[in-house]
């Protein structure tokens, strides 16, 4: 696919990134498979629909970020955690093939809203207002860590805040369906900031519809 698109920087990532050995081109369950690349598109649309609903810009897609998400999804299919192999911001989710937005947004927004209300008596924050409030109030994440749990682990609001960041402008998303850990599918959502071109993540952006 990337070869057909002339996306040399994406090919470079797939072939030469730090954890390239976790990617198996030709494996139908690998994040490089066309089926799994197509499977990620509704999830990208879901993210953009939510951002639009709270007054934020929709994210554009770049092939380089898609490639980073592919490499990260394949790595995190095997290792429970972030690969840290790229200078992108990343959300990960493990599930049985469902949209990760409820994990990243719906669940964590509920934690965020409750923490903000209990700590500061504030309600109704969404979008940029929620992101800005978090930046100026340092106690929210630690409160959530201490008072909420997800599958036995301390909860976070970091994935939610990543999705609603006003600073990001570009994304890539990938699904690995090998199910190495507990039969889970692995979703990786990688982003780059608006106006930041240091590593070329924002080169030749297109809309999700154009990508599809």
Residue ranges of predicted features:
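Short, well-ordered surface patches within globular domains
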Residues: 1-90, 101, 160, 166-178
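A well-ordered secondary-structure block
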Residues: 86-205
